[in-house]
Amino acid sequence: SYSMEHFRWGKPVGKKRRPVKVYPNGAENESAEAFPVEV
C-alpha cells in the first residue's frame, strides 16, 4: 500500500491520515483510502 500511495501521491498520506473534513459527503471512510488530502 505504501508503494502505491507513494507512487501516486508522492507521500503515504492515504493510510497515515484520514481527511474527514475533505469529505463532507460522509464517504470519508472509503474515499480516504483512494483519495487522500492531496485530492
Swiss-Prot record:
Tissue: Expressed in the pituitary gland.
Coiled-coil ranges (or none): none
Acetylation among keywords: yes
UniProt KW keywords: Acetylation, Amidation, Cleavage on pair of basic residues, Hormone, Phosphoprotein, Secreted
One annotated GO biological process: regulation of corticosterone secretion
Location relative to the cell: Secreted
N-acetylserine PTM positions: S1
Record's function text: Precursor protein for pituitary hormones that regulate stress and environmental adaptation.
PANTHER family attached to this UniProt entry: PRO-OPIOMELANOCORTIN
Protein family membership: Belongs to the POMC family.
Protein name according to UniProt: Pro-opiomelanocortin
Organism: Oryctolagus cuniculus (Rabbit)
Gene symbol of the encoding locus: POMC
